[in-house]
């Protein structure tokens, strides 16, 4: 999926169209309205590196843990997550059944880096940077999911509503499975001026309609 600037660049390169036709198409892109999120896409340095370089995974044999030939093989990848996800599209596209991610929550408290710099609460492009960051990675994650694949995404109140809209756009509302609310703190906390929060969320989406998923396998407990 192209962002607006990439689409406009493609239109400018089209052959066989007049200047008036080109101007009309660009105006159409600029004025098109849609339901959902709109943000200013922010380029990442790691994304620019992918334009001319192919990420390659290198095995570090002295860190291997041998667990027997008949046991499952697992891979631990160290590196930038956008590079790692891109590399996996060459080997695991459409092959992964379950993905769990715990992305930066974008609280403004030095939990989110963009181009090697922390994004703080004073950054006027804070939400655009976070959305650009998440959009690129979630679209690749969707490619990695198998047809019966499902993804779990941890988040808190800062970006939960925004993330839901973004995921509805990427995975479609039809593939929204549910939103788990879980208690992350049991100690009394009074850090908020209004309502104290002791919970986080896990958004769940599947690649295809979740009617194909085998749900409700555990009996209801006391």
Task: Tell where the protein language model's regions lie, with residue ranges.
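DnaQ-like (DEDDh/DEDDy) 3′-5′ exonuclease domain used for proofreading
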Residues: 1-100, 106-130, 136
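Conserved Class I SAM-dependent methyltransferase catalytic core
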Residues: 127-180
